Amino acid sequence: CFYTWETRTRTVDIENGDGAVTSTVEEYTVAVPVSLYQAYANLEAELGRTITEDDKSNINHIYSMIAGAAGGGNYNGEFLRGDGSSIDLDISAFTDPNSKNAADLVTYAIHAWESGWGYVWGTYGDVLTESLFAYKLEQYPDGVGSYEDFIRANWLGGRTTDCVGLIKGYGWLSPETMTIDYGTHGMPDIGANQMYYSATESGTIDTMPDIPGLAVWHDGHIGVYIGGGQVIEAMGTKYGVVKTELAGRGWTHWLKIPYINYD
């Protein structure tokens, strides 16, 4: 009910026994969330009846677990917005632009915060153009459409992301072109919960080691721990990318993000 499958291609570098590297193009399949309205229609077709408001409530809950919470809810605790407005991507402080590592994930997240990135469900760091905004309105008529006026007034023309998109955007960033290329560099397109459940190293928040670049998670939401008891997170449509304190934010678990090097 919630996904459609798409076949895409990617370039993979393979190191041969003699140390030479060759590139090959391979096909891969990704699961892409359908729009919320399409999920309603799919369930009606599956059940053979008109769905009820209770059905829709259940779908909304499952959908947010898959794709992340759309508006981010309300938060009354302290948070700090970055004061920048740049759309430039800056990797000058990366330790190793050619690998996907925890230190550079932290640098990337801090850059997104300092640059004042906004929040739009289903985005991952690209500039929110009129055409991209129109596509997201069609794709997520509730999750994005409900905030259309706010997004247009506050985020249009700047870079935007959602919570897990902040991590995926780093994974998909190609340093040679300085573009965020969907589904590349071994980072799949997965939601916050899928990222948590696919981790091989994780634990409850009270067991969290002090390692910058870990992700912190609760059901439907994920952020990047940057050290010093602080987190960068794409909090929600009305907040954008913000800095918060780790303690008291409701995080339940930590994880080493799959596809990120922590050595």
Locate predicted features.
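Membrane-proximal envelope biogenesis segments
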Residues: C1-D96
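Intrinsically disordered, low-complexity segments enriched in small/polar residues
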Residues: E15-G17, E46, M65-G71, Y75, ...
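N-terminal capping segments
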Residues: G72-E176, D219-H221, I232-A234
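Low-complexity, Gly/Ser/Thr/Pro-rich intrinsically disordered linker/tail segments
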Residues: R249-D263
